[in-house]
Amino acid sequence: MALPPGVPFLIRVSLILAFAPVCVVIVANFIWRHTDVALPTWPVTLLSVASTPLTILVRVWYRQWKYQRAAARLGAIMPPRWVGKKLGNLDILKEMLQTMQSGYIADFAWKLFNNLGNTVQMNVLGGTAYLTCDPNIIKSVLATDFNNFEKGDLFKQEMASVLGTGVFNADGDMWKWHRAMTRPFFSRDRISHFELFDRRSEQAVAKMTERFHSGYAVDFQDLISRFTLDSATEFLFGSCVNSLHSPLPYPHNQHPTPFSHPSSKSLASNPSRAEAVASAFMRAQIVLAERVAMGAIWPLLEMRKSRTGEHMRIIDEYLDPILKDALRRKEDMANIGAGIHDDKESSDTDGETLLDHLVRLTSDPVVLHDEVLNILIAGRDTTAGTLTFVVYFLCMYPDVFNRLRAEVLEKVGPNARPTYADIKEMRYLRAVINETLRLYPVVPFNIRWSIHEGTLPNPDPNGKPFYLPPKTPVTYTVFAMHRRKEYWGPDADEFDPDRFLDDRVAKYLTKNPFIFLPFNAGPRICLGQQFAYNEMSFFLIKLMQHFSAMELAPEAAPPESLPPAEWAVTGWGRKRIERFWPKSHLTLYSNGGMWVKMVEADDFDKDDRDVGI
């Protein structure tokens, strides 16, 4: 049985902290033995107690001095520094945790960038870290200087209990191997699984319509999370978890129901397997986000047990039988002489799932488990989050809704199933999705660690480059970058899909493509980008075909999940006007769900479809 993360961490830290006092005692004992001078107990005790903080202070001072000299040697400077008010800058850590729990996304980062510039140095508990929203620095980290950055040991330790050694938690040769193993599956032909999208979207829309007919609002975030989970499990494993078969939740003041979205805190005592799996996914990711926020001291929160252990048990109970069945099929095929096709032939096999593809390449159950879980989390949460925010904006901006629906009816019609060619022609649909991804990128923060020392570009053309020490974390926030007016213009806070269609494209985006990074960039750019665009586009088209109007229903949400009233007075940018509370674990989500009401379209032929729930 593995030890809880906190136990070995505490042992390591105790040994480190005890080193200086032990040295003091050894020196005092040496003096007494070789000079017959017995030092008084009180100065030895005082020096022993003070030796640890003094050692830490000296190490921090020396590190800063060394960095300053190294920067001068390279003709560089250190970025502006966020200086805290408490020992070890613990107030900085406290403010970041408070923002995560009770604030608006990137509150603390926005304040820093406004006061100190778009790249800031932080020193918490003696460690140096950088925070940036500068597109040129992000470009350096993700692309031009890619080989000098990695996920880093600390990040991988924080994520290991959930992501294992999967593609999102691997570096170097391991990452290259995972990437090469997965890439062939995500070709244009494979990601056009529109029959799957059609079947699942019809189920989802039917569930919504039934609830609307009963006079209730629907938590769209819950519903779309079921749609993406069912689509992802069928697409990736060929075995659907069928979460859409479970009842939808009711508004907070209506009938109590089984679990909906974990943020609503309405988990029933006996949820279905699908509901339990969905809940476990989100709760595990919340733990991971808290670990990242705590930094190196995260194991202190897990002294008795791993906080992801129970959630992963539920997930593994679902995944393990699927993996064992796939490996058994592979063995059976080998036994009857069917053999394994060469890669080229197999890559063209119709109906092959990602798991089928991976099983042809490896029989290692741990590798298979980690890889499919990584892809499942990415395939479910990112798409669900974006579609949730698209529907929010369509409710907030009826003119955008009407224009988008008009494009759908013109290009596809009120009943037809959209094709890949249809979606390619729908420029306004893509603009709506992109504008949503700009204001609410599903991964608001990300991190890389430098391997060697180097420099980062200074936004001041006349300034010296910024020095980057080795083994230093660089956290970059596309959430803040996507809203900075120096990159997107004076209307950066406004939701306006036309910015991706008019002259602002050439003025801002074409000039610097790295100001828009919803799918990351460089060698680690999202492999499933086109799959996500196809899935989101398909579902939105179906939504426009079925419904002629939509509006928010905040009265249906738990009152404590709504934005605090003071945001309208003290908030910055969109924080002042938003009608939902965005939060983040690994990806963005809406606190308490996204409750909406919709009006069924008169021009949709309800008899034209045969939908089974």
Curated annotation (Swiss-Prot):
Transmembrane residue ranges: 7-27, 37-57
Keywords: Glycoprotein, Heme, Iron, Membrane, Metal-binding, Monooxygenase, Oxidoreductase, Transmembrane, Transmembrane helix
GO molecular function: heme binding; iron ion binding; monooxygenase activity; oxidoreductase activity, acting on paired donors, with incorporation or reduction of molecular oxygen
Pathway entry: Secondary metabolite biosynthesis
Subcellular location: Membrane
UniProt similarity note: Belongs to the cytochrome P450 family.
Protein name: Cytochrome P450 monooxygenase 75
Organism: Postia placenta (strain ATCC 44394 / Madison 698-R)
